[in-house]
UniProtKB/Swiss-Prot annotation:
Catalytic activity: (2E,6E)-farnesyl diphosphate + H2O = avermitilol + diphosphate
Gene Ontology MF: a single term: terpene synthase activity
Gene name tied to this protein: tpc1
Keywords: Lyase, Magnesium, Metal-binding
Keyword Ribosomal protein in annotation: no
Stated role: Catalyzes the cyclization of farnesyl diphosphate to avermitilol.
Disulfide bridge positions per record: none
UniProt remark on cofactor binding: Binds 3 Mg(2+) ions per subunit.
Family membership noted in the UniProt record: Belongs to the terpene synthase family.
UniProt-recorded name of the protein: Avermitilol synthase
Short name of any one Pfam family annotated for the protein: Terpene_syn_C_2
Residues at which Mg(2+) 1 binds: D80, D84
Residue window of motif DDXXD motif: 80-84
Coiled coil residues, start to end: none
Length: 335
């Protein structure tokens, strides 16, 4: 597994205080809601260190906000693993299961006797939206819908058995990675709301997409061995290998180039943002929110990168959960 690949991303600028308190909260939360059982399941989950990811990726978060970020990360990864088995090779079942989750986004509620994933997501969504700006709720609801809907398309790609083209890969991968959602969670955790005129400017839209792609592309390299063994096709290295008919080393080098180009573009556009804010006539408070949001995006890229290069989720997966079986100990998303 190419865990020693260096993408040249900066170290995290900071880490949220209160990490140990959030560790205690998060462990209690996943057990109370049934996301994680006892024994090997609990030991495996604990080794991922979701609270550390939250503290590094969301340095603006404090207290309950940091707890929410850690719980959201726990949901993401436990939910994702449920598709590393029969469900992930059955597009119709995947779509049906994910409709339940999408219904929660649109107000349906999990219902009595809900499965652990539905109950956990309902809790995360309720806490995220409590007191949030309506604009934030609207666009974050769309992001969750995209995330859930993309699961069926990843299943379709697994059945195809060969990587797709770059454009199709990005459409599915951006969905299943859900990496636009941490940016929105980071915005919420920082206590800001980016003005719509700035949020939808070419500069911030391109920067946001770059931050999303950097995160998922680095992850594709670090999780390559795990994903290839399970027949996943939506991986940047595999897509490049297939399209260019090149070697593994050449594909990894090309993947690093894709990341580097996006980091450079992000930095270029960041320098344009002060003038953009002036042109839009933003107030001092609004400009401060935009500036903080740039920090949110930077923190997520560097914080996630720092976490994924150390977590046992990627270094230990082939030994803990061999690819001959499902990628989880507990089935918490019944169909």
């Amino acid at each position: 597994m190419p865990q020693d690949i260096d993408f040249g991303l900066p170290a995290p600028a900071g880490i949220s205080p209160g990490l140990e308190a959030t560790r205690r909260h998060n462990l209690g939360w996943v057990r109370r809601l049934g996301l994680v059982g006892d024994g090997p399941s609990l030991a495996w989950y604990t080794s991922w260190d979701m609270p550390r990811l939250a503290a590094c990726g969301f340095p603006h978060a404090r207290g309950a906000a940091l707890d929410l970020c850690a719980d959201a990360m726990a949901f993401f990864f436990v939910f994702d693993d449920q598709f590393d088995g029969p469900l992930g090779r059955d597009p119709a079942r995947a779509a049906r299961v994910c409709r339940r989750l999408t219904g929660i986004v649109h107000g349906a509620g999990p219902g009595p006797g809900a499965d652990a994933c539905s109950a956990a997501f309902a809790d995360v969504w309720a806490r995220s939206t409590d007191g949030a700006h309506p604009g934030w709720v609207a666009r974050t609801a769309h992001e969750w819908e995209y995330y859930f809907a993309a699961q069926a398309h990843e299943a379709i790609n697994r059945l195809r058995g060969t990587p797709g083209d770059m454009e199709s890969y990005l459409q599915v991968r951006r969905g299943i990675a859900g990496t636009d959602l941490p940016l929105s969670l980071g915005e919420r955790a920082a206590g800001i709301t980016v003005p719509a005129a700035a949020f939808h400017s070419p500069q911030l839209r391109i920067m946001r997409e770059a931050a999303i792609d950097v995160t998922l592309m680095c992850n594709d390299v670090y999780s390559l061995e795990k994903e290839e063994a399970r027949g996943d096709m939506d991986n940047l290295v595999l897509v490049i290998e297939h399209a260019r008919r090149c070697t593994r080393d050449e594909a990894v080098t090309a993947a690093r180039g894709e990341v580097a180009r996006r980091v450079i573009r992000f930095e270029q556009l960041a320098r344009e943002v002060p003038a953009l804010c002036a042109q839009l006539g933003l107030s001092a408070v609004e400009r401060a929110h935009v500036d903080t949001y740039l920090g949110v995006m930077e923190a997520w890229m560097s914080g996630y990168h720092a976490w994924q290069t150390q977590t046992r989720r990627y270094t230990g997966a082939p030994h803990v959960l061999p690819s001959t079986g499902p990628g989880y100990f507990d089935e918490v998303l019944p169909t």
